[in-house]
């Protein structure tokens, strides 16, 4: 039995860079601030600059931070600037030390469980059928991912409804409704097949706003690693008026013979087409989350660090949200996206193309701040309140997300109104206005609200989006989700292991395209290490996002009360999500699997991985 040696090296690599000068690790219950490094005390009460009796000391602190916490070039692609400078580097090392401390028990479990999983499939005689992939999961991974894979994910992996509904749940950031007034049908599909599948024509679906596109054709520009293969799929989906379901219509590979597959093809051909799409989608989800959550939240916060005193209440809130944030990209650069590293070991495309994706998508799709507000993004893609097509029967991402973000908005609204009794007070806050100017200036935040900021509503929107990015959006694509849903084998491999077919028909066995026993366990174990099961017992879940003494004690009774209400709301949402069951049609939220990826009682409040 070959050991999973790729797991063992990560701790050594990260520890080499994650040593604090004093050897200590900051407790997760504190609001980490740079004040420990600048020599200024952590505040016990937050004040606005216009109300501070020692304004000069605030100015000195900010000047020191601006001198010692600087912008340096982006890492892992050309996205946002990273944190540097003498103090900035120490912040990164401190956060890496805490991050590796949290990783270590998960990594140890994953190493042990991975070897047990590999032995189990080898004792079985290897992977001989698609059903054998279940052996890799059954009875394993309870330490690293206690909840296991999502109920229904494996038993229904051939389901077209499952494949389609994943576009509205486990990776909801790609699909969009085609607008008959501004879009074109991206590729043709055999007319007889369309009629058979939909009861109507492709043009009628398009003109009625019932046709949807998920497009990964840009990946045709990428070159797969030796022995790895990938298509660059586009997939069409439609609203079926007969069943009331959101279903797949066709998948186009955009490579080689550029075949177009439909559900009417031979079952193995069609299942392979869905697998090929998922290879593209899996790559997208993992790198999109990096450019959309990490890169965006980091740079907005870095601008705040350089302009807000540690006594500023907004600074205190941001530092809670950004717990451990600067550990992730720095660690990923050396241990995940390094040449031959963990990413290269599993995915079809190397780290070179991960960086290219981040570089290409950050300025256009992933990085714009206001355009990615929760509902704004869904509306822009025609998934919510579309005027040019029928309502989706189910949109699980929004069904859960709108409840969570409304609770976040309520807390943030109280926080902002407590800090600023009027828009006038906000307008007169010199540090806050400097932050907005810095974000639009040296920090180069894309699509950030312009300076000056005039209303409390605008600030509440900014802070709500920051909380959404760090505590919710990130975990839809990362954290435990790839293990439980979006990376479950055999439907979701990180790479193909045989060339994309040049013709349809004649496929008797899909195993040549799928990872073997060793590569399968490597993929599963990598995803297991993304999870953080200890956060529940450590009170680091979304439910506890604002529940930290230093923040609440320094901002007043109204904010404390708002946190209590927030925790009650999160508890209610968590109970609803965690107790989901299938209905009498075998569905949950219109899907043949139970999705719990946004459970506030399980996901972290921060950018965990």
UniProtKB/Swiss-Prot annotation:
Post-translational modification: N- and O-glycosylated.
Binding site for Mn(2+): 289, 294, 474, 478, 609
Needed cofactors: Mn(2+)
GO BP field: linoleic acid metabolic process; lipid oxidation
EC number: 1.13.11.-, 1.13.11.45, 1.13.11.58
GO MF, one annotated term: metal ion binding
Reactions it catalyzes: (9Z,12Z)-octadecadienoate + O2 = (9S)-hydroperoxy-(10E,12Z)-octadecadienoate; (9Z,12Z)-octadecadienoate + O2 = (11S)-hydroperoxy-(9Z,12Z)-octadecadienoate; (9Z,12Z)-octadecadienoate + O2 = (13R)-hydroperoxy-(9Z,11E)-octadecadienoate; (9Z,12Z,15Z)-octadecatrienoate + O2 = (11R)-hydroperoxy-(9Z,12Z,15Z)-octadecatrienoate
Principal subcellular localization: secreted
Endpoints of the signal sequence: 1-16
Localization annotation: Secreted
Keywords, alphabetical: Dioxygenase, Glycoprotein, Manganese, Metal-binding, Oxidoreductase, Secreted, Signal
Domain Lipoxygenase: 117-609
Pfam name, any one: Lipoxygenase
Cofactor note: Three His residues, the carboxyl oxygen of the C-terminal Ile or Val residue, and a fifth residue, usually Asn, ligate the metal, which binds water to form a catalytic base Mn(2+)OH(2) for hydrogen abstraction.
SUPFAM superfamilies: Lipoxigenase
Carbohydrate-modified residues: 24, 115, 156, 193, 385, 539
GO terms under cellular component: extracellular region
Annotated function: Lipoxygenase that metabolizes linoleic and alpha-linolenic acids to 9-, 11- and 13-hydroperoxy fatty acids. Oxidizes linoleic acid to mainly 9S- and 13R-HPODE and alpha-linolenic acid to 11R-HPOTrE.
Protein family: Belongs to the lipoxygenase family. Manganese lipoxygenase subfamily.
Protein name, as recorded: Manganese lipoxygenase
Source lineage: Eukaryota, Fungi, Dikarya, Ascomycota, Pezizomycotina
């Amino acid at each position: 039995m070959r050991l999973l040696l790729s797991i063992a090296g990560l701790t050594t690599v990260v520890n080499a860079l994650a040593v604090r000068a004093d050897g200590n690790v900051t407790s997760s219950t504190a609001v980490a601030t740079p004040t420990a490094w600048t020599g200024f005390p952590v505040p016990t009460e937050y004040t606005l600059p216009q109300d501070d009796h020692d304004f000069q000391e605030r100015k000195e602190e900010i000047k020191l931070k601006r001198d010692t916490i600087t912008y340096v070039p982006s890492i892992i692609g050309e996205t946002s600037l990273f944190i540097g400078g003498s103090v900035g580097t120490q912040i990164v090392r401190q956060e890496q030390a805490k991050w590796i401390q949290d990783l270590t028990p998960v990594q140890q479990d994953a190493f042990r469980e991975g070897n047990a999983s590999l032995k189990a499939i080898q004792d079985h005689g290897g992977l001989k059928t698609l059903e054998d992939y279940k052996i890799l999961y059954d009875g394993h991974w309870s330490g690293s991912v206690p909840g296991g894979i999502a109920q229904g994910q494996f038993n229904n992996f051939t389901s077209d409804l499952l494949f389609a509904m994943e576009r509205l749940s486990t990776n909801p950031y790609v699909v969009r409704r085609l607008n008959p007034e501004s879009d074109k049908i991206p590729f043709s599909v055999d007319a007889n097949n369309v009629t058979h599948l939909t009861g109507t024509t492709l043009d009628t679906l398009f003109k009625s706003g019932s046709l949807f596109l998920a497009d990964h054709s840009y990946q045709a520009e990428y070159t797969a690693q030796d022995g790895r293969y990938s298509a660059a799929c586009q997939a069409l989906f439609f609203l079926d008026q007969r069943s009331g379901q959101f279903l797949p219509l066709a998948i186009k590979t955009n490579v080689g013979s550029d075949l177009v597959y439909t559900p009417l093809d031979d079952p193995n051909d069609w299942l392979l087409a869905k697998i090929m799409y998922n290879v593209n989608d899996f790559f997208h989800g993992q790198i999109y989350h990096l450019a959309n959550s990490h890169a965006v939240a980091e740079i907005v916060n870095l601008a705040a660090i350089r302009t807000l005193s540690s006594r500023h209440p907004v600074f205190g809130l941001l530092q809670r949200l950004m717990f451990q944030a600067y550990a992730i990209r720095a660690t990923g650069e050396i241990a995940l996206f390094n040449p031959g590293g963990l990413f290269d070991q599993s995915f079809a495309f190397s780290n070179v193309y991960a960086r290219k994706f981040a570089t290409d998508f950050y300025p256009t799709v992933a990085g714009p701040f206001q355009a990615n507000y929760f509902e704004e993004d869904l509306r822009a893609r025609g998934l919510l309140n579309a005027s040019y097509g029928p309502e989706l029967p189910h949109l699980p991402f929004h069904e859960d997300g709108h409840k969570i973000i409304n609770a976040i908005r309520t807390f943030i609204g109280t926080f902002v109104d407590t800090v600023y009794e009027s828009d006038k007070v906000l307008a007169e806050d010199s540090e806050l206005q400097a932050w907005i100017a810095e974000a639009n200036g040296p920090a180069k935040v894309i699509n950030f609200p312009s300076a000056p900021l005039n209303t409390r509503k605008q600030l509440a929107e900014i802070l709500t989006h920051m909380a959404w990015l760090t505590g919710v959006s990130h975990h839809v694509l990362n954290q435990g989700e790839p293990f439980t849903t979006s990376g479950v084998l055999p439907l979701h491999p990180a790479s193909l292991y045989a060339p994309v077919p040049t013709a349809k028909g004649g496929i008797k066995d899909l195993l040549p395209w799928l990872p073997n026993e060793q590569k399968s366990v490597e993929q599963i174990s990598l995803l297991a290490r993304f999870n953080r099961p200890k956060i529940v017992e450590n009170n680091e879940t979304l439910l506890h996002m604002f529940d930290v003494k230093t923040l609440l004690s320094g901002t007043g009774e109204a904010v404390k009360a708002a946190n209590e209400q927030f925790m009650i709301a999160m508890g209610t949402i968590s109970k609803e999500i965690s107790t989901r069951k299938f209905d009498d049609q075998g569905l949950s939220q219109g899907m043949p699997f139970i999705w719990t990826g946004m459970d506030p009682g399980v996901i972290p409040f921060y950018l965990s991985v």
